[in-house]
Regions:
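S-adenosyl-L-methionine
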Residues: 7-51
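Mobile active-site "lid"/loop adjacent to the S-adenosyl-L-methionine
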Residues: 10, 32, 50-80
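C-terminal catalytic and target-recognition region of SAM-dependent MTase-like enzymes
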Residues: 89-148
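Helix-to-beta-strand junctions that scaffold the AdoMet/dcAdoMet cofactor pocket
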Residues: 85-87
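Conserved SAM-binding motif I beta-strand of class I
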Residues: 1-5
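Short amphipathic alpha-helical segments
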Residues: 15, 43-44, 64-67, 105-107
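Active-site-proximal loop/turn and secondary-structure-junction residues that shape catalytic pockets
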Residues: 34-36, 58, 98
């Protein structure tokens, strides 16, 4: 497992979650870095991964003030990252909490980028928070998955 996040706090939190889940002794690399730059280096190194779980931010600023928006970059991020998938990948999942980026759009990007190269199928859904008092669910995001 390789956990990559540009936020030192998020990486620390992920490490704490692994420890709380009794997974601290499992092999995991904890990397604080820009995910796209990390993937570009992994491509040059020839690294390959069997699975990807992506939870990119909706919005961010680079060190030089560059503005990054997921809805403008989701296709490029997925096409970059699919280059590090192994020859027989297991799955590729992406979550988003970005208004205006629907589950169907994310599924379409996975379907048009991954399926022609490695086959498989895609699915998508909304992410929701359960409301105990009413038994309802408040939509708060989207998820899309490609599987072999």
């Amino acid at each position: 497992v390789t956990d990559v996040d540009a936020s030192k706090c998020m990486v620390a939190w992920a490490r704490e979650n692994a420890q709380a889940s009794s997974l601290a002794d499992r092999p995991c690399r904890w990397i604080v870095d820009d995910c796209a730059k990390f993937v570009q280096r992994e491509i040059r190194r020839g690294s390959r991964y069997d699975a990807v779980i992506m939870d990119p931010p909706s919005y961010g600023r680079g060190p030089n003030g560059e503005i990054w928006k997921l809805e403008d970059n989701v296709y490029d991020l997925i096409t970059l990252t699919e280059q590090v998938l192994s020859d027989k990948p297991l799955f590729f999942a992406i979550n988003s909490y970005t208004e205006g980026l629907s589950p169907a759009v994310m599924e379409y990007v996975l379907k048009t980028t991954l399926c022609p190269k490695v086959g498989g199928h895609t699915s998508c859904d909304e992410i929701g928070l359960p409301v105990t008092a009413t038994g309802g669910v408040v939509p708060c995001g989207a998820t899309a998955v490609w599987e072999e």
